[in-house]
Structure formats: C-alpha cells, structure tokens
C-alpha cells in the first residue's frame, strides 16, 4: 500500500468521508492540491480553497484529461470524481461524461448546484500501470468570463479530486 498516496487522499477529503478512506485505499488518485497526473494544466485554473479549506481548481474547457498511475490488473474498478458546479443562465440539466482510455464509463445529467461526487464502474481488460481519464460535458468557464453576455453564460465547474478504487 502506498501510504503517501493514502495520506494525501485522507487529507483531501472531508471529515465525514475519512472512515471510508481507511477501509478503501485508492488504486490511483489525483487532486487539485498537487496536480499529479494532469495531462495538460492549460485546461485548469489556479488552485483555490473552498469554505472547508479543501483545494479545487477551475476547469476552463472540456474535455480535460488526467493520467492516473497505479497497478491496474484485469477486473472491475470504481471511479469517483468530486466536482463543484454552479449554474448561470442556461437551465439544467447539464451533461457530464467520463471516459477511461477512450471508453465512456459514465454519463450524468446534473440538475443541482453544489459539490457532487460522481461514481462509475468500469472493467479494465488489460493490466497496466496507468489509465487516462477524460471528463467532458457542456460546461466550461471561459477565460473572458462575462455573466452579462448570454453567449458566455454556462455552467461553472471546478475540480477537487478523482480516484479509482
């Protein structure tokens, strides 16, 4: 077990989720706090802290890709993504999709504001040391954000962490 990974995962989570973390160590993990595994940081904004002192960063435009390293064997895994969403002008629902190595493993219609933990199961058909997770959808925060311009008002999104259990 990678105790540094487990410690980072433990510190990143809220108090109510820590008991679960001690039971389920992640196979792979990336969070906004350290940007480990991010394929391209150009899609992510500066690191910020929310009211609970948890690190997040803005997602500028989909799709965003994160490379997760771990000891992946054949079998079933659970992917969890924690993200925050805030609506502007467009009425919900918003579509969010997650792909693992080019295969869609989950799709959600998000209808509520706030912080969400999305979960999807997927099968790993071949062993490997890394997977690439791509998050896509009809949400973004443009660089020249203007809440009064109807063409620019879409869903605001920020990224907390992603884990594979």
Model-assigned labels for residue ranges:
Residues 2-76, 84-91, 139-165:
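Glycan-recognition and processing domains
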Residues 76-78, 93-95, 130:
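Exposed beta-strand and adjacent loop surfaces of beta-rich binding modules
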Residues 78, 91, 110-112:
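Structural signature of nuclease core domains in nucleic-acid processing machines
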Residues 90-103:
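Short, surface-exposed beta-strand/strand-loop-strand elements in extracellular ectodomains
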Residues 100, 110, 136-141:
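Predominantly extracellular/lumenal beta-strand repeat domains
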Residues 105-127:
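Extracellular carbohydrate recognition and processing domains
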Residues 123-137:
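Noncatalytic modules at the cell exterior or secretory-pathway interfaces
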């Amino acid at each position: 077990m990678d105790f540094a990974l487990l410690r980072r995962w433990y510190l990143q989570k809220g108090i109510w989720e820590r008991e679960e973390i001690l039971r389920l160590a992640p196979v792979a993990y990336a969070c906004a706090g350290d940007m480990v595994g991010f394929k391209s940081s150009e899609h992510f904004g500066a690191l910020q802290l929310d009211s609970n002192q948890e690190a997040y960063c803005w997602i500028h435009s989909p799709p965003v890709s994160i490379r997760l390293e771990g000891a992946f064997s054949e079998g079933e895994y659970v992917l969890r993504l924690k993200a925050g969403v805030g609506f502007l002008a467009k009425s919900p629902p918003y579509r969010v999709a997650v792909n693992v190595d080019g295969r869609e493993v989950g799709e959600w219609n998000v209808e509520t504001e706030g912080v969400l933990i999305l979960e999807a199961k997927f099968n790993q058909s071949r062993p490997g040391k890394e997977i690439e997770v791509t998050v896509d959808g009809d949400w973004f925060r443009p660089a020249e954000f203007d809440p009064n311009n109807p063409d620019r008002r879409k869903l605001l999104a920020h990224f907390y962490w992603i884990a594979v259990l």
